[in-house]
Amino acid sequence: MRFLHFLIVAVLLASFMESGAMPRNPKKKRGWDTPAPCRYCQWNGPQCCVYYCSSCNYEEAREEGHYVSSHLLERQGR
């Protein structure tokens, strides 16, 4: 029974964090608070790139050698 309780709590916590209510790293600014620099793409991978780099210029990101997710490229029509 305890395992079931733990599992439910873990799933709820994971979905809460995934919804963006809690940033994965509280020290970093959330994408909807301030436009974050393109380096978030490189640090956090494709999921965070969509959130943090939505206002990011793809050409600038590519020139700086940052990773840009395919989802972001689709949004910018590339």
UniProtKB/Swiss-Prot annotation:
Which residue windows are coiled coil?
Answer: none
Q: What does this protein do?
A: Probable neurotoxin with unknown target. Possibly targets ion channels.
**Molecular function, one GO term:** toxin activity
Q: Which UniProt keywords apply?
A: Amidation, Cleavage on pair of basic residues, Disulfide bond, Ion channel impairing toxin, Knottin, Neurotoxin, Secreted, Signal, Toxin
Present the record's domain note.
Answer: The presence of a 'disulfide through disulfide knot' structurally defines this protein as a knottin.
Keyword Lipid biosynthesis among UniProt keywords: no
Source organism? Californiconus californicus (California cone)
Question: So which domain of life are we looking at?
Answer: Eukaryota
Under what name is this protein listed?
Conotoxin Cal6.3a
The chain residues annotated with the modification Glutamine amide are Q76
* Cysteine disulfide partners in this protein: C38-C49, C41-C53, C48-C56
Gene Ontology CC terms, in alphabetical order: extracellular region
**Propiece residues:** 22-26
Question: What is the annotated signal peptide range for this record?
Answer: 1-21
Tissues showing expression: Expressed by the venom duct.
Where can this protein be found? Secreted
